[in-house]
Amino acid sequence: MESTPSFLKGTPTWEKTAPENGIVRQEPGSPPRDGLHHGPLCLGEPAPFWRGVLSTPDSWLPPGFPQGPKDMLPLVEGEGPQNGERKVNWLGSKEGLRWKEAMLTHPLAFCGPACPPRCGPLMPEHSGGHLKSDPVAFRPWHCPFLLETKILERAPFWVPTCLPPYLVSGLPPEHPCDWPLTPHPWVYSGGQPKVPSAFSLGSKGFYYKDPSIPRLAKEPLAAAEPGLFGLNSGGHLQRAGEAERPSLHQRDGEMGAGRQQNPCPLFLGQPDTVPWTSWPACPPGLVHTLGNVWAGPGDGNLGYQLGPPATPRCPSPEPPVTQRGCCSSYPPTKGGGLGPCGKCQEGLEGGASGASEPSEEVNKASGPRACPPSHHTKLKKTWLTRHSEQFECPRGCPEVEERPVARLRALKRAGSPEVQGAMGSPAPKRPPDPFPGTAEQGAGGWQEVRDTSIGNKDVDSGQHDEQKGPQDGQASLQDPGLQDIPCLALPAKLAQCQSCAQAAGEGGGHACHSQQVRRSPLGGELQQEEDTATNSSSEEGPGSGPDSRLSTGLAKHLLSGLGDRLCRLLRREREALAWAQREGQGPAVTEDSPGIPRCCSRCHHGLFNTHWRCPRCSHRLCVACGRVAGTGRAREKAGFQEQSAEECTQEAGHAACSLMLTQFVSSQALAELSTAMHQVWVKFDIRGHCPCQADARVWAPGDAGQQKESTQKTPPTPQPSCNGDTHRTKSIKEETPDSAETPAEDRAGRGPLPCPSLCELLASTAVKLCLGHERIHMAFAPVTPALPSDDRITNILDSIIAQVVERKIQEKALGPGLRAGPGLRKGLGLPLSPVRPRLPPPGALLWLQEPQPCPRRGFHLFQEHWRQGQPVLVSGIQRTLQGNLWGTEALGALGGQVQALSPLGPPQPSSLGSTTFWEGFSWPELRPKSDEGSVLLLHRALGDEDTSRVENLAASLPLPEYCALHGKLNLASYLPPGLALRPLEPQLWAAYGVSPHRGHLGTKNLCVEVADLVSILVHADTPLPAWHRAQKDFLSGLDGEGLWSPGSQVSTVWHVFRAQDAQRIRRFLQMVCPAGAGALEPGAPGSCYLDAGLRRRLREEWGVSCWTLLQAPGEAVLVPAGAPHQVQGLVSTVSVTQHFLSPETSALSAQLCHQGPSLPPDCHLLYAQMDWAVFQAVKVAVGTLQEAK
């Protein structure tokens, strides 16, 4: 006997003698035995083959093929029982093969006909029915559970693959049934791509998804190789027997170069009069999913359109029956179940031919439970039982799996929204119960209901595949570079995820490599992810579209900005409930009414959760007003009669005793959300400033030791020197955030700060002053919290130095004009070369060249500047704006309200019509005569009749995660649609230009917006030639130098102040403006414009400077809430403004709403729901981070 081939060395030789394996030889020329059934082979039928190493003389290999040794190769020494491996006490008494854990070989094809053409099938051991005591024997590659063992993971090499005879050239005619070993070009034994194991899907067969392999249901037929699909030269389908058979077989598993056409057609064509044998729907190498690739009638998929189910004609003398795949070669039944095969089809022959049998009985017979149990199913059941938790297999094994009809009925009874998706109708966009934590939900109610309107579609992948079956044919479309196999199938050197590690008996939680390891489509080599920018775009990058899912990076950003506020709200809730209990009030009643106004009837503040309401009307009181009204509750109960139902009106008032304590969300749900949020904080190292996070160890019971070690590790104190080393400043900047968050007991353990000389003290103090509050950029005393070990003299010197250098730091940080940042080069010149962005110096503005910047660069830079309260200029919007929608010809037909704006007062309505306004828009000589000290404006809200403009605006908005109504970082997207969102609708503003000699006028007076604002300049008139010189002189006289460059069409000038300077500006306006003109109320129209002289006085006398932004057509200016700003149009312009609610300014917006008494009712209704929007956003963020690995 020849030696074992090189590609078989080191592989386990699983061989048994013929009696052990249940192989019964068949003499040549003997007639077939009774009881043989063709079609898909049942898992219990005997077969003499495993991995190409045979023990019988009449092997399936061609003559002369090297045979393996007779003795069985022992297992690897030192390997104990692992997941899926054999148990000696269980398998010791069983006949047949002994099992070792098997893994999928990528991408081996376990599909093939049970009896190829002119093949003499193997004889089973028994001629009767399917006995349960049959020993285990397998036909090559018909069983998807005998796979390559883990021993083959040691080193990559060519793995022998068994191919059907019609794909191998040179097969001898005396062995027409042989399935020779052939090196498969796609097979590798290194790290395997992540494929859900065959054992995890139960009776649905194995599930394989590989984007590099052509798909049967969606890919066109022309994309495949004609020789592989059994096509002739003309591209038409070829029937069996029309092509010549191969004539040469190469030794050592090498394929001949002159391979003939494939005689087995891949797809079944139209029925023919010539009888032919049914063949598999995909050859080896095209592995598909039994449950969701085959298309049914009406699906429109290619797999069904190519031909109807055919009735094959097998060499067996039995009558033909309809084949239904039990292996991956055959399509399942329409209901998604698997049909009978082999011996299991014996009992269905009579029932399948009769047409009068009920369909339910046919479904029962053709379901996956029709196969009687055997030794192999016991093996599979045990394996599934062990791994049911890992692979989320319901109830452990397929024998107890419910049929699809019963499962749908159960879901329908339970009110599951998946029934609608399975039956074909779309699920509702917003569930009927959007308020979690009601009495019906109980524990865990905060995360049971997910708001689908904000793109939070949480679908369990395991249940999704199990329930939808063949209707979810596109569920396997994922990133072609990510691995698709479970962690247990990875090489031993790679770490496993937490669930896989626990299943293997290991401890600790490891991050799964499925999100970090990529593979080449055909090479089969694993490589570590190196492009962090590409990887972060899917995890941390912003999502676009109303139905996109919240990414991990955005969830962290939401939680870091809103978590502290939610903690304060929850603490206020606990205090309110504790006070109500002390007052003797009953338990709070949970109310579930989405349309009720969440506003206090007395102070018009927002209602978060706990409040008092009248059970007979809509009268409600917040916590503060409820306490005031509850002081006389005891007196009312003692001496006064309670209010009757007839007297319950708004005019008559409500007695305190008639109000009832009410909640929108139960206290239990809020407590669970608070616990989950703090655990996510600890898990992702998100820093919070709430008192609850002072000791984070209480929120992480399993990681108490690690948290203790992390709190003990403090950064070393930098050693200052007198030589002015720049590295010292850098180290202090990097370590200051960490040291500022350390607990007091850890700071006390540090030694005294080394300050041996006055020079070192001055240097360290100056650095601390420059690292003051980010939003203020000014010195303050004391600069840092006093340390227990600090000397009193050191604190006094810090205060003195802070007072001396405070004004200089202010002037440097709040310098006038537009400073050169990473996106600018001297004003409005050309942008800088594309280099890695760096954090700009304090006071510099950000100019984004792209409306949707890269997640790792421009987007994070915007968040940094936006967090500091700075405006941002965005260019490049003109590429998406449609000029025909925003021109004067298109806008002239629209109506609008014309207003006259003066420098000292709010805009006043004008008697001019919109047609007259648009006639003088581009021609000053045609403009109506008006006061020299006023400018005409036109305002219009874009409503339903402006659908095309609204859609174009939505597609052109910069940073849609913030500015768009469905943006994940826009808190308005977490509120239900209604009248409350009306203040956020886009507004159209058109204004005449201000001539250079009228610099004291503006097109928008100084005002403060309650919400964040984005203003896009959609159209600007061309300035006259005589204005260029005057315009240049006017721009050169603005604050700062180099703000204007020749060639750029500057249309508007923005002056933006910091929100912290609003109070100083109010006091300055009260001094320089007439009575009533200096008011700067939030949300009210501006009543004063600051010209160059007033801005200079404000800077010199009050130390308040402003940023100057020059806006051109196709650019947008983003202004944070609370920042005073004014606009001056140099030419006639048309702009569109839209408000949004960002997490960074949500707290300031709520505060400004209470300070603005002149806000319209719609604005009060919007900002009254800010706390509820914060709750919804935090709930979605916590749910996303809990599911993240």
From Swiss-Prot:
Residues annotated as transmembrane: none
Domain JmjC positions: 946-1157
A GO-annotated cellular component: nucleoplasm
Reported effect, residue 1056 to M: Markedly diminishes histone demethylase activity
A Gene Ontology biological process term: regulation of transcription by RNA polymerase II
Matches recorded under SUPFAM superfamilies: Clavaminate synthase-like
GO molecular function: chromatin DNA binding; histone H3K9 demethylase activity; histone H3K9me/H3K9me2 demethylase activity; transcription coregulator activity; transcription corepressor activity; zinc ion binding
Phenotype upon changing residue 1022 to A: In ALUNC; likely benign
Placement of sequence motif LXXLL motif 2: 758-762
Mutation effect (residue 633 to Q): In a colorectal cancer sample; somatic mutation
Expressed in which tissues: Strongest expression of isoforms 1 and 2 is seen in the small intestine, weaker expression in brain and colon, and trace expression is found in liver, pancreas, spleen, thymus, stomach, salivary gland, appendix and trachea. Isoform 1 is always the most abundant. Isoform 1 is exclusively expressed at low levels in kidney and testis. Isoform 2 is exclusively expressed at high levels in the skin.
Motif (LXXLL motif 1): 566-570
Illness the protein is tied to: Alopecia universalis congenita: A rare disorder characterized by loss of hair from the entire body. No hair are present in hair follicles on skin biopsy.
Purpose of the protein: Histone demethylase that specifically demethylates both mono- and dimethylated 'Lys-9' of histone H3. May act as a transcription regulator controlling hair biology (via targeting of collagens), neural activity, and cell cycle.
Protein name listed in UniProt: Lysine-specific demethylase hairless
Naturally occurring in which organism (per UniProt): Homo sapiens
Lineage of origin: Eukaryota, Metazoa, Chordata, Craniata, Vertebrata
